[in-house]
Amino acid sequence: MKIARHLAPSSIALTLTFALTTGWHAPGRAAEGDVKLVRATLSRSLSAPFLWGFNSIGEKYGLRVQVLDAITNADQQRNIQTGGVEIGSVGYQSPAGMAEQNVQNVKIIAGMYVGGQNLIMRKGVELKTWKDIEGKKIGRPPGTYAGILFTLAAQVNDVDLSRVSLVNTTPAGPPELQALKNGDLDGFILWSPIIDRVVIEGYGYYPACCDIGATKEFGAGNQLLAANTDFLKDRKLAVTFLKAYVESMDFYGKNPDKTIALVAEYTGGGAAILNEAMKHSRWTYRVNVQNAINVAKEGPKFGFTKADMSGKVADYFDLSYLAEATGQSVEQLGSYGP
């Protein structure tokens, strides 16, 4: 059940009633008049094909999803917070930001996506241990969660970052790809499927030693499913949605050919690159609350909060709806498990 994060975003936000066809339809679809609309906000990324392709499964639960394109986690949080949508994706650093802003009407109700952002190195530049990064020229996009995870992972692994030539790079992709190819960078941090293009085109590799999401403290969490509390007031609807959400995630996880066809259609990504991306990330409806708390402690250092908001982060998770939908306990759902 694997997949990946951030592709080139669309230049404008637009509302899309998802109409991509996958050649598959769920049995027992509800009558048209019985279908309820749930609005979602997502980036055009690889993090949630099971929401872009939700309707073929959701309709047997009497639900359809309409997607509002958004570029950043902040955009998506704002759409949920203002009631423009019922649900959407946010990042693992988002609960800390919401706590500092005293946001009262958004709760995280499920997991979504793990991995999909990492360090990629140029072929010929050998990296066997984290310490080998010292002396290398590494591109890091400032203000991004991928950049934060790299810094935290490097520190956990005793890298002296003062001995690393860190270059501020863009989150766009093409300039970084060219810089790596030309030898202007030894490596850079970004998200899939941009970094997977490097592997497929043969001039870069994932260093086995140095997965930025492999630390116990901070993990590889990427995207979470959040909801407006007005939507959650209808508990039956919210639980039903989560049942369909889990089933859709499971379906696309077990049918990678359909996933790749779907993602290629709405992102324009090539099948080989998407296949590579799927090796380095995964979907899960479970979350890791402790990772989010640990990340929140680092907020002041990286500037995504002014103060340490870690003591309030757990209050932004309400996994009781997911527990009812799955039959698992809140405690089970609050960690990735073995």
Regions found by a protein language model. Give the residues of each.
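Pocket-lining segment of extracytoplasmic ligand-binding domains
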Residues: 93-94, 172-263
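Short, glycine-/small- and polar/acidic-enriched structural segments
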Residues: 30-172, 182, 186-192, 208-209
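Bacterial N-terminal signal peptides that target proteins for export
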Residues: 1-12
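Bacterial N-terminal signal peptides
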Residues: 10-23
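Secondary-structure end/capping motifs
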Residues: 233-308
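Conserved C-terminal helix/tail region of periplasmic/extracytoplasmic solute-binding proteins
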Residues: 302-338
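Short, solvent-exposed loop/beta-turn-alpha elements that line the ligand-binding surface or hinge
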Residues: 60, 211-218, 282-289, 311
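Sec/Tat signal peptide C-region and signal peptidase I cleavage site
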Residues: 23-30
